[in-house]
C-alpha cells in the first residue's frame, strides 16, 4: 500500500465561519484643528490606519482636505451657505494643523439669488498674495432698481457690465496682493470687500447681492513650519530657548 497524504483527512469541515476582524482596530483617531482665523478651532476628527513598518500615519494624513461649513467654524448660522476647505499641513501628536485651501457657496444659495428682471455679473482674477500663495477669486453681483425707478426691469447695458467687471477685478487684485492668505481669509468672513465693491460701483449701476462666491488655491509656497505654527497661535518669534548651565567632570589626579 502506498504511503502518502490522505486528501480527505486534510479537508476542513464545511460551514465553518471565518474569523471576522474589526477593521477599526487597525485605525486611530486624530483631531482636526482649524487656523486661529476662525473662532471655533475644533473642526472634528478623522480616521487613519495606524503606523506599521515603513507606512507612517502622518504621511497618509498630510495633504488631506476636509470641507467644513463656515457656520460651524464661526458659531453663527449667518454663514451657513459658505463651505470652507482646510488642508492638513502638519501632524503634532494627535492634532492635525490645517491651513486654508478654498471656499465655495452652496448650490441652493446660488440658485436662490438668480431672479428675473435683473442682470448677473461675474468676474474672476488670479492673484498672488504677499506670502506667495496664488489664488483665483470669483465674484458675483446682481443689478437692482434705482430708488426712484418705476420700470420693473433693472437690466444693465454691456458697457455698464464691462465697467463694473473692471472695478471688481481691480478691487480684488488690490485686496489680495496687499494681504497674506490669513489676512484675506479674515476679510471674507465679515464681507468687507463686498461692501467696498457696492460703494465703488453705485455711480455706474446700483448692485445687490455682491459676494465673493468662490476662492480656489492654485499654488502654495514651500512648506514653512514656523508660519504654520504662528497661524495656529502655537509659536512666536520671540520665544527662545534657555541656556542650560553645564557641569564639569571632576578630574582625578591619581587612579
From Swiss-Prot:
* A GO BP entry: translation
Where does it localize?
Cytoplasm
One Gene Ontology cellular component term attached to this UniProt record is: cytosolic small ribosomal subunit
Q: Which domain of life is it from?
A: Eukaryota
Query: What PROSITE patterns would the database entry show?
Result: RIBOSOMAL_S3AE
Question: In this chain, where does the modification N-acetylalanine occur?
Answer: 2
Disulfide-bonded cysteine pairs: these are: none
What molecular function terms (GO) are annotated for this protein?
A: structural constituent of ribosome
Which Pfam families would you find in this protein's record? Ribosomal_S3Ae
Keywords, comma-separated and alphabetical: Acetylation, Cytoplasm, Ribonucleoprotein, Ribosomal protein
> What family does this chain come from, according to its entry?
Belongs to the eukaryotic ribosomal protein eS1 family.
Under the subunit heading, UniProt states: Component of the small ribosomal subunit. Mature ribosomes consist of a small (40S) and a large (60S) subunit. The 40S subunit contains about 33 different proteins and 1 molecule of RNA (18S). The 60S subunit contains about 49 different proteins and 3 molecules of RNA (25S, 5.8S and 5S).
Which PANTHER family does UniProt cross-reference here? 40S RIBOSOMAL PROTEIN S3A
Q: What is this protein called?
A: Small ribosomal subunit protein eS1
Q: From what organism does this protein derive?
A: Candida glabrata (strain ATCC 2001 / BCRC 20586 / JCM 3761 / NBRC 0622 / NRRL Y-65 / CBS 138) (Yeast)
In the UniProt record, the gene name given for this protein reads RPS1
